[in-house]
Amino acid sequence: MKPVVLVALLWLWPSSFLAYPTATVLPDEEQNLNHYVQILQNLIMSVPTKEQGFGRKFRSSRTVDGAEARSLSSEMLLTPGLVSAQEVTTPETEVMLTSMVEKTTFPSSGFTMESEKRRTHSKAFWSIQPNNVSIVLHTEEPYIEKEPEPEPELETEEESRRLATEPEPEPESESAPETETRQTAESEEEVETSTAQNKVRTGTSRMSTVITQTTNTQGTPNTVTVKTINNLDVSTESEDVPQLSGQSEILNVEDLPGHHSLSTRHENILRKISNINSQIHQGLLSDHSSPAYKEFIKASREHLKRSLALAAAAEHKLQQMYGSNVFLDGHTSDPDDDMEVIINMLYNSRSKLSDYFTINHVPSELREKATVVIAVLKKILCVDQVEMQSLIRKLLSNNMKILNILNVP
């Protein structure tokens, strides 16, 4: 019987009493827990998310009455395994909960049907992982005062006249412009440090700032004007930065039209010189005792001697040609020498005479002279049309006589 009774008791005994033993919570502990929960709730509400509408819906869904907030806070504090809210509520806890509800930032308004329909479930704060990118922490941004825009010169003149007529401001009004001038000096130092990193200096520009501030001291408005003019070295790192309107543009040699072709020619010449230099060094490093190397040296020396002799002869001929009076109008020295020079010149340039006597290939400044020369040569070398016809007739008659003699039908 005893085993049967024990089995029945174990079957009827509630499982919650065995798994979760009861525990009592002291008022001090409950107060501390409520305080920590309130801090955590404020932290969660202060963390903004990417979706602004979600935060608004979350705030609207958290609007509860005093009694409902008290019940919700007590349910959040006590887990179902420890104790219920009715068993622990004491006068001290009620006072603490009411004060906590009054301190909360939630507006005291009841639930509505739309808020219940649109209520969204937020993620618990203890389940947020550190690497969750959807949560953006909001840092307190420093307040940056914007510099006022410079006013026209007419207003500054009127303000200077007004300052001359009005009494001097008190030290309190002078402290505010000093702080603003310090801010402008700091901004100018930042501009100088940022421009110091650039490479090319383009020029200097003057920057002037006019700061005005109105202060009411003893019921009378006083206007303080502070004008600072500084010279700042403005530099640009690349050509993408636009030039200021007042600066003069610096012409670059590379922008000229013929500079590109000249630079390419110079580069080609330098490349050829470097190739020749490398070949010379390679020849010097080879064996000097080889017979092929000695023959190559002798042939190169003879070739150089010939080229130098030809260059000297050509230079001598040019000096003679330029020294003669052939090209002067109406003045001739020795006709035999002049004829020799001209015939030799035409003979040496016989391969290019067709290019020299075509008007399209002649430069514009020499076309008049070229036309005169070509006309004279045509008169000398070519025959008139009448003479051409007579010559053709003679040739035809001679051909007919030859055919008659040969009895060719």
Swiss-Prot record:
| Subcellular locations according to the entry | Cytoplasmic vesicle, Secretory vesicle, Acrosome
Primary location class: cytoplasm
Polar residues bias (residue ranges)? 198-208
Per UniProt, the ranges with Acidic residues bias are: 167-177
From the UniProt annotation, give the residues forming the signal peptide: 1-18
The answer to whether keyword Iron-sulfur applies is no
Using the UniProt annotation, give all residue ranges assigned to the region (Disordered).
141-223
* Gene Ontology BP term (one): acrosome reaction
Which post-translational modifications are recorded for this protein?
Answer: Glycosylated. In testis there are two predominant forms of 77- and 67-kDa and a form of 47-kDa, whereas in epididymal sperm from caput, corpus, and cauda there are two forms of 47- and 43-kDa. Testis forms contain complex carbohydrate residues. Epididymal sperm forms are N-glycosylated. Then undergoes significant glycosylation in the testis and that the majority of these glycoconjugates are removed by the time sperm reach the caput epididymis.
Q: Out of the domains of life, which is the source?
A: Eukaryota
Low complexity compositional bias, start-end: 209-223
Keyword terms, alphabetized:
Cytoplasmic vesicle, Developmental protein, Glycoprotein, Signal
An example Gene Ontology CC term for this record: acrosomal vesicle
Q: State which residues carry a glycan (glycosylated).
A: 132
**Family assignment?**
Belongs to the SPESP1 family.
Describe the function of this protein. Answer: Involved in fertilization ability of sperm.
Q: What is this protein called?
A: Sperm equatorial segment protein 1
Upper lineage: Eukaryota, Metazoa, Chordata, Craniata, Vertebrata
The gene name on file is: Spesp1
